[in-house]
């Protein structure tokens, strides 16, 4: 009997010790999570999938930190355009931002691989490469430039709108003044197709379309809808010529100021928010097209027309493939070939 009591006492004491250790560990972890409010700014609308993803991220950070860590959302370029946001994040005066991959080409030319025309056939391919080893290596390299890459979110496949005519073939772009992202691939692609590319920040686009300073622009349908471009554009052509990913970027200064438990919260919240943002983006694409059909003339290109466009922009792809480098190009090509072989 005494032996049983002794064993029981030892077991109880051991359990108490374990619980005490866990409590101490939990207290230490809690102490490592400091109260802080961070800012997440971007150019798109709050009701766009990116905005909804940003809110999901903010909610997750608050939940996982017990309310200690907060993220304030600033949509619609209220703190500045993409270039200003990027500079602010690098400088540490802004904590988070997200923007098109093309805008990172000034930091690392290899990011241009994501902007090559007609590279991806569908979102499945785009997501696989965006989550793959090449993308991760490029994101990791941003730490040398004051940035932490937390993954690549989804903006979608770009389509063309304009106020003049439907775009069914390259010739239809002749002479059109088309707003483009201030990125080399976009500028050269539209030049090659006969348009006059006009680099412009996103916040300026609606006003330029309204005043007829430009004839058209290109964006995924979700952006076209949320930005209300249908109010100032008549034609939507579903060209799907470039897929645009949105790297989710964090200031390295903010990251370096964090404890390991805080970093863990950020990484977990970013991964969960990315999955949610992509889900919302995919769900909204078909709905957005249906909504835009009610207020715009929408045309879909034939497969033959798409192939002709692909052929027309091949010199652009070849040119920038050289700048991106054979290593990245070969790896991305291999990733896509492996994916397509599974179909």
Q: Residue ranges of each PLM-predicted region?
A:
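N-terminal secretory signal peptides that target proteins for export/translocation
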Residues: 1-9
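N-terminal secretory/targeting leader peptides
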Residues: 2, 13-16, 31-125, 133-134, ...
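Sec/Tat signal peptide C-region and signal peptidase I cleavage site
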Residues: 24-30
